[in-house]
Structures are given as structure tokens and as C-alpha cells.
Swiss-Prot record:
Keyword vocabulary terms for this entry: Cell membrane, Membrane, Transmembrane, Transmembrane helix
GO cellular component: plasma membrane
Record-given protein name: Uncharacterized protein PM1101
Primary residence: membrane
Organism, as annotated: Pasteurella multocida (strain Pm70)
Topology within the bilayer: Multi-pass membrane protein
Taxonomic superkingdom: Bacteria
Compartment(s): Cell membrane
Positions of transmembrane segments: 40-57, 72-94
Length: 126
């Protein structure tokens, strides 16, 4: 089975529509992050919409509503910061490749026993 460690090799495999291959190393780490982003995009949009809607309410009041809103906004801010960091890491690693990979291939995540690094076994979707 074809083993891929570099971005250029992955580009070639996707272009040639290889039936199956394994991604290892740092590239596998980046592709796993990219896969995670494809599943949480809706959450990010929902969180941003919620923050926008809540921003019209005063959150500095002494009541329970103000306290709850402050805590919610802090939690969403932490969540959004974490997700933005992941998005930037994936963009630097090649988001287009990740989208092509997950659109056309089944990905099975595993761990290399020797190196304890992530591996991704990819097989083309029928």
C-alpha cells in the first residue's frame, strides 16, 4: 500500500485517484485537524450568531441574567479562540487538500504502534 508523508505525494495520490493509501507523520496530524473542522463549522456559525444576538442585551446588570450572559460570552470566546487556532493551522497545512481527501475517500484513523503518531488509512469512496 502507498505510504504518504508529504503534501506533494498526497496531491499526486488524489490527482491519480489512488484506490487506497496511508498518510503518516506530520501530514496525518494536519489532516486530522482538518477533518475535525469539517464537523464543527456549524457549531462555530451557531456560536457567532448567538454572540451577535446576545450582544444587544446589557450584560453588566446586577441581575442573574447579566451574570449568566457574562459567563456564556466568556465560554464562547474561549471556544472561538481555540477553533480559530485550529483553522489557521489547517489553512497553513493545505485545507484544499483536506477537503478533496474527505470528499472522495473514507478515512480510518489509527495510531502507529512504534511512533505513537496518527495514521490515516484512506480508501476511495464507491
Amino acid at each position: 500500500m502507498l505510504v504518504i508523508n508529504m503534501k506533494e505525494d498526497l496531491e499526486r495520490a488524489l490527482k491519480n485517484k489512488e484506490p487506497s493509501f496511508i498518510i503518516k507523520g506530520e501530514l496525518a496530524e494536519k489532516m486530522k485537524k482538518a477533518q475535525r473542522i469539517t464537523t464543527i463549522d456549524k457549531w462555530i456559525l451557531g456560536a457567532l450568531a448567538f454572540v451577535f444576538a446576545v450582544s444587544f442585551f446589557p450584560s453588566t446588570s446586577d441581575g442573574l441574567f447579566g451574570i449568566i450572559m457574562n459567563k456564556i460570552l466568556i465560554a464562547i470566546g474561549i471556544f472561538a479562540t481555540f477553533e480559530i487556532a485550529i483553522i489557521l493551522a489547517v489553512i497553513l497545512g493545505g485545507m484544499t487538500l483536506a477537503m478533496m481527501l474527505y470528499k472522495n475517500y473514507h478515512a480510518e484513523f489509527g495510531t502507529d504502534v512504534k511512533t505513537e503518531k496518527i495514521t490515516i488509512k484512506c480508501t476511495i469512496k464507491k
